[in-house]
Amino acid sequence: MSTSPKPVAPIHVIGGGLAGSEAAWQIAQAGVPVVLHEMRRDLPSSSGAVGPTKVRTDAHQTDGLAEMVCSNSFRSDDWQFNAVGLLHAEMRKLDSLILSAADQHQVPAGGALAVDRDGFSAEVTRRIEAHPLITIEREEVAGLPPEDWDSVVVATGPLTSPALADAILELSGEGQLSFFDAIAPIIHVESIDMDIAWRQSRYDKEGPGGDAAAYINCPMNKAQYEAFIDALLEGPKAEFKDWEHVPYFDGCLPIEVMAERGRETLRHGPMKPVGLTNPRDPTVKAYAIVQLRQDNALGTLWNMVGFQTKLKHGAQAEVFRMIPGLQNAQFARLGGLHRNTFINSPRLLDRSLRMKVAPRLRFAGQMTGVEGYVESAATGLLAGRFAAAERLGKTLDAPPPTTALGALVDHVTGGHIEGEALGKTSFQPMNINYGLLPPTETPKVGDDGVKIPMKERGRAKKRLMSLRALADLDQWMAGA
């Protein structure tokens, strides 16, 4: 008499952001049931209340899965010469839900992969809801998960609820680490003066969709730039007393903080004028240029690239309307500020992203100390695959460190401790970059046998590292 196979117990994923959604997808695709817990929800009207009660975080505006808060860009899609583009390529090979939805809902952005936020989130939500092995529970997990949840992926992101954050910190015995995260304004395109601004991508570089004019550019002469910097420095900022000693992450600095570091900082950063030519005055180079990037598929909303800010809302409208072309700007959303929280992963996590003192808990996303949408989703992809393999009684090692995925694992689980001998005593969030991968010899001769010019050898080295990464990932996948 045959007996039915014992049903596989579900894995619980806490958090429906990019990391949690990716983790849930990877687990379910491996044939393991998942319960995805997301605290953002709409509650029925209570007696006497008008309309539904919305449960949100300080930064989220919807209850959609994988809502993108800070920007709509997944950054460069160039796998040969850019580390985040390489990470895109690796994740596509591994059936990433986030990259698939991003590809489906991309908007023009030069060489970057940017998406229509609403369409992207709706697509992720639709696929998760439609998967037969995924159940969504709209509820907050307060405190540590119940003990009978024997496999949990914690992907609660930078805005982890206080109850869960406190429970994790008590369990770990570590102090909380945090940094500011700021949001850039979004503008209605019809309010941009295109008699002043123009469409062009830097160096006319084409993006995945073939558009070489994916940005709106607003030029400034020196006098306009100096006046703008003065107003930026003098404008009233939002104060957060409890966060005064929290460090900023350099990859998402508020624009006024960059200006405080030096008056020329912005024109060598997000306002750099290189690679752009004003068609109305092609012989005169702008002193600085503000760029806007398409934010939705309709092309009606555009975000100010690199203009995350903690200026008070009234000051934002006044200061940003000083920018030529934006003098009549109508803002669909003004910038804002929220706190980001992450754990001391090198001390707390093993190489399969499990908590050493509580192996039933895995972590993914920004809480692990990666920075950026793609990096967060990548750790969700790995945590999901690790958890599914464990549930199925298999062993799955991390990808080799020569891959972008493996390099991220190395960063969050070991790079910090190695650096302590050099006096680096604080673990900080990190974007993917070639510096996290083991170096290769710098090539001197190309595939065609021709000597590579000295100034091009750096790019050639990046391409070699990318080719090595994809080959090593293929080998890892074959043995997984």
Curated annotation (Swiss-Prot):
Keyword NAD included in the entry's annotation: yes
GO cellular component: cytosol
Required cofactor(s): FAD
Subcellular location as annotated: Cytoplasm
Keywords assigned: Cytoplasm, FAD, Flavoprotein, Methyltransferase, NAD, NADP, Transferase, tRNA processing
GO MF term set: flavin adenine dinucleotide binding; tRNA (uracil(54)-C5)-methyltransferase activity, 5,10-methylenetetrahydrofolate-dependent
EC number annotated for this UniProt entry: 2.1.1.74
One GO term of the biological process aspect: tRNA methylation
Tagged with keyword tRNA processing: yes
Coiled coil: none
Catalytic activity as recorded in UniProt: uridine(54) in tRNA + (6R)-5,10-methylene-5,6,7,8-tetrahydrofolate + NADH + H(+) = 5-methyluridine(54) in tRNA + (6S)-5,6,7,8-tetrahydrofolate + NAD(+); uridine(54) in tRNA + (6R)-5,10-methylene-5,6,7,8-tetrahydrofolate + NADPH + H(+) = 5-methyluridine(54) in tRNA + (6S)-5,6,7,8-tetrahydrofolate + NADP(+)
Binding, FAD: G15, G16, G17, L18, A19, G20
Record-linked InterPro entries: FAD/NAD-bd_sf, MnmG-rel, MnmG-rel_CS, MnmG_N, TrmFO
UniProt similarity note: Belongs to the MnmG family. TrmFO subfamily.
NCBIfam families, per database record: gid_trmFO, PRK05335.1
Function: Catalyzes the folate-dependent formation of 5-methyl-uridine at position 54 (M-5-U54) in all tRNAs.
Protein name: Methylenetetrahydrofolate--tRNA-(uracil-5-)-methyltransferase TrmFO
Organism expressing this protein natively: Caulobacter sp. (strain K31)
GN (gene name): trmFO
